[in-house]
Amino acid sequence: MMTNKLHLSTLGIALLLLFGSCGGAEKKVAENDGLETAADRVEKTELPPKAEVGEGALVRAELIYPLENRPTPQVHASTLVETSNGIVAAFFAGTHERNPDVGIRVSHLENGKWTRPEEVVNGVQNDSLRYPCWNPVLFQPADGPLMLFYKVGPNPREWWGMLITSTDGGKSWSAPQKLGEDPAIGALIGPVKNKPVQLEDGTIIAPSSIEIEQDGETFWKVHFEISRDQGRTWQVVGPINDGVAFDAIQPSILIHDNGDLQVLCRTRQGVIAESWSSDQGQTWSEMQATSLPNPNSGTDAVSLQDGRHLLVYNHSTKEGEEPNGRNILNLAISADGKTWEPFMTLENEPNKAGYSYPAIIQSEDGMVHISYTYDRETVKYVVINPSDI
């Protein structure tokens, strides 16, 4: 459900070429009307140098497992959660994204060290059919078992959402369950990449999106899957965009002090897009462009205990001088969700596959934990002290 207000910012009107990505074909090209583009803004933004551990807010930075003797050739789409037993990470891993051998692996931070990741679920359907797994999302509700959402299917247009749960902090897991179907979107997806949020009344809102093929084009649309019974049933809200003004997927949810919700979304328009809700996610404003660039790559965001908001993202476009695309990874901070200031560069040294698909959480002790794909070969984990920002 959407409101009727539509106001694209200057940045949103001056669209870049639309690029395809995994799960989406290239399509329509918007005209540049001479206004400032995302690439122009990238050039004008002075980013800080790459952060070093012990300087400023960066407390820790390490690979979850070394490149040598790694358990699988490739890994992607990590997720983090804090449990009573500590920090847990999950990601999909196998020979290559989309290959049937890709499953979901889990690693635990124990006594200051990460355990070797172990596969906890895969896409085996029967003795002769196995699909790849995609985009795990860990979530610990206030009252209930640890949840691990993931997707199974041949591609993002045909996948479906699955769920396993754990009552011992991710040491053992329940049998997989399919999330179900909904008339608005078909198969329920669950949180498509980024973590759900839980409201004070216990409502869980999972940020999600779908990719729809129509007349030879692929349209990206954001929606929400909402549960009021600890994930047993789900209500779908949306899609909230038409996939034309903005091709948007993979939203992350911020919660503001006044109760308003805000989503920040990956797009194919060269910018991060946003939408707002003032009724606990039941209706949403029309999407607008933010001031931040996006090279068609995943982002994540978190609302801090002190009311500020952090966003981890690639501050770049697909074109221009290196580092561009996914070869730079940044942190930005905002007091109101509208004005963002890039304050830390996590990576800026070009490599083969870049730094991408970050996840970000804040633990009870106030520290901020971030994970992200590192050259598609391992996952990097960093810790930020927000009191030093």
Predicted segments, located by residue:
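C-terminal motif of bacterial Sec signal peptides marking the signal peptidase cleavage site
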Residues: 18-21
